[in-house]
Amino acid sequence: AGTKEWLNKAKDFIKEKGLGMLSAAANAALN
């Protein structure tokens, strides 16, 4: 259970960072 919780947290973290990188790329493309 502990490992599953850690994996879920890691997935959420990567998802948030991925969205941030997409936003940064979109802003760079628009500028």
Curated annotation (Swiss-Prot):
What is the recorded phenotype of mutating residue 23 to R? Moderate increase in anthelmintic, and insecticidal activities. Gain of activity in causing an increase in intracellular calcium concentration on neuronal cell line but no change on epithelial cell lines
Result of mutating residue 3 to W? Answer: Moderate increase in anthelmintic, insecticidal and cytotoxic activities. Gain of activity in causing an increase in intracellular calcium concentration on neuronal cell line but no change on epithelial cell lines
Q: Which domain of life is it from?
A: Eukaryota
A Pfam family this protein belongs to? Ponericin
Effect after changing residue 30 to I: In (swap)Nc3b; No or weak change in anthelmintic, insecticidal, cytotoxic and hemolytic activities, and no change in intracellular calcium concentration on neuronal and epithelial cell lines
Where is it localised? Secreted; Target cell membrane
Q: Which GO terms describe its biological process?
A: defense response to bacterium
The tissues where this chain's protein is expressed are given as: Expressed by the venom gland.
Q: Which GO terms describe its cellular component?
A: extracellular region; membrane; other organism cell membrane
Q: What GO molecular functions are on record for this protein?
A: toxin activity
UniProt keyword list: Antibiotic, Antimicrobial, Membrane, Secreted, Target cell membrane, Target membrane, Toxin
What is the recorded function of this protein according to its Swiss-Prot or TrEMBL entry? Membrane-perturbating peptide with a few moderate activities. It is insecticidal, since it induces reversible paralysis in insects (L.cuprina) after 1 hour, but fails to kill them. It is also antiparasitic, since it moderately inhibits the larval development of the major pathogenic nematode of ruminants (H.contortus, IC(50)=23.2 uM) and reduces the motility of adult males of the other nematode B.malayi. It does not show antibacterial activity (MIC>40 uM). It is not cytotoxic to HEK293 cells and does not induce hemolysis in human erythrocytes.
Instruction: Tell me the protein family, please.
Output: Belongs to the ponericin-G family.
> Could you identify this protein by its name?
M-poneritoxin-Nc3b
Q: Which organism is it from?
A: Neoponera commutata (Large hunting ant)
Lineage of this protein's species? Eukaryota, Metazoa, Ecdysozoa, Arthropoda, Hexapoda
